[in-house]
Amino acid sequence: MSLSNKLTLDKLDVKGKRVVMRVDFNVPMKNNQITNNQRIKAAVPSIKFCLDNGAKSVVLMSHLGRPDGVPMPDKYSLEPVAAELKSLLGKDVLFLKDCVGPEVENACANPAAGTVILLENLRFHVEEEGKGKDASGNKIKAEPAKIDAFRASLSKLGDVYVNDAFGTAHRAHSSMVGVNLPQKAGGFLMKKELNYFAKALESPERPFLAILGGAKVADKIQLINNMLDKVNEMIIGGGMAFTFLKVLNNMEIGTSLYDEEGAKIVKDLMAKAEKNGVKITLPVDFVTADKFDENAKTGQATVASGIPAGWMGLDCGTESSKKYAEAVARAKQIVWNGPVGVFEWEAFARGTKSLMDEVVKATSRGCITIIGGGDTATCCAKWNTEDKVSHVSTGGGASLELLEGKVLPGVDALSNV
């Protein structure tokens, strides 16, 4: 799925116009401090383009976290983002305490030329996602008439609409598909992301290696299935590997992750790999733990020895890392989605760290390396490799759905050209 038939910001006339722009400022926070500003930085080129080309105003809207339609300004306010954005843009940013309603509409109706406005968290309104919880935590659905009113209010905040929220492009939420303006364009981040994935999937450099980690096979079935039609090699690591190893090798896996649902189709996936000539690499050894805890007792295990009862595998071992390194060394293009161990904890980070080192090495010899957002992007931030790979996606779920071969609603909703 590419933007080839969609309107993009570089083709949009913004002079004298109010631009309402959906961005993805869903950044990690600790004690109201932003811990990784990658997503904010990623939106700056689109914002600057509008200002440099004479836009009257740029009104930015985003979600943060999962307040589920309940206003939680103490926990999920976008106000800290306004300060960060001010320092990145080098100009004042007006923060509004809501995202819809008469006061917001007034503030956005006729601002001074060149004004940048940031709205409060869209998800403080249940109408953004269409469902959520009430103040007591009971599940609720938004009323259709109220969804329409919410969308109509957002539509009043600009003359043209730009969507640069690649990280949310897989969600058919009000701010993504419900703004009713004559011109709806994809921003530069959206364009960059979609172009990278389109090229990677439609005309890949070969050998093409997919590294798939993470926990559940069931969550990644469509991903594995779709990628088996595209790649030459695949590493299946992380917690997901135990389901494969138990089914294929009858390995004793102790209390390691096991996915009942996913187990049923392991053999089908392996048969497809064989039919397509895809070489699959699974881990052969493990770092084990006596409980799921940062300070657990640790041990070693292999596929042959099995993992003892009451213990679990939380990282791959050195032999697995060697096998992974060989696969990486053969590749001319790599897409990596999901870590191969519990990298957040030092004792179980070595497998993912050594794989990252190999991917960085591959990049420096000209291999195209694409990191598919989410946890794997967090690994890049943690080990400072964001500029040492070809592309770090800003969207975990969105990149996953592209790799699964799905149409993204947020892209679908843009104006055709």
UniProtKB/Swiss-Prot annotation:
The modification N6-(2-hydroxyisobutyryl)lysine is found at residues 97, 216, 220, 323. Its cofactor is Mg(2+). The gene is PGK1. This is Phosphoglycerate kinase 1. The modification N6-malonyllysine is found at residue 131. GO terms for cellular component: cytosol; mitochondrial matrix. It comes from Cricetulus griseus. The modification Phosphotyrosine is found at residues 76, 196. ATP binds at residues 215, 220, 239, 313, 344, 375-376.
